Amino acid sequence: VLFRSTLWPVNTDIGWYDAVDGQRVITVFNPLWDNYAGYDHAVKLLRLQNVLTKEVETLTPETEEEFGNDPVRIYKGDITISGGYMNIFFMQNLPSSTDNKHRISLVRPQEDDTLYGEDGYVHLELRYNDYDDLTGRRSPGAVSYNLNSLDIPSETKGIKLKLNSEENGEVEVTFDLKTVGSNEKLTTNVDLSNMQLK
């Protein structure tokens, strides 16, 4: 298992990829050697694919309509927290045109006392706006949200995330941050090229 491992890419044929600080990617690779030059593994990169990377936004009465609250299809285990980011994989019901991209947002309440709840959890919502443009064609989607802007206190128990699930309606998912190794899932060959999100 390569979770929480340091990797050294030994192939240099990825010069086409322009790395941007803070940009999350899905990396497909083959492990070559263990314990290589101070890294856990040397790997041959097969593919790098950018993941939509966004900041947490503030939900206000003025932004409520723009963020929407349309249902989204997310399967159990497809929301993870790692490296200061919340990573979400889902099945997008594609819009009719690339000009009509849907919006997916991780939002925080406007008031800090609501964000940092008395229960010891940070309270967030996943919001989706399909702009009433659905084709019934599905494609995998992925998005990562930078949680570092939240200034989460060290005594925080975790994160409670509200979302509108296609399967279960309004639900709340709890992520306990104190459990090492929780909420991790091995991601394999996912093609995000058809995703239509902003």
Regions flagged by a language model, labelled:
Residues 13-28:
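Short nucleic-acid-contacting surface segments enriched for D/E, G, S/T with interspersed K/R
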Residues 20-23, 127-166:
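Short, solvent-exposed, Trp/other aromatic-anchored flexible loops in extracytoplasmic proteins
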Residues 28-30, 89-91, 125-127, 146, ...:
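Residue-level recognition of well-ordered beta-strand positions that form the cores
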Residues 29-41, 135, 152, 164-173:
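Short acidic/polar inter-strand loop motif in beta-rich domains
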Residues 35-91:
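Surface-exposed beta-loop interaction hotspot
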Residues 75-134:
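Short helix-loop boundary/capping segments
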Residues 167-198:
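Short beta-strand elements
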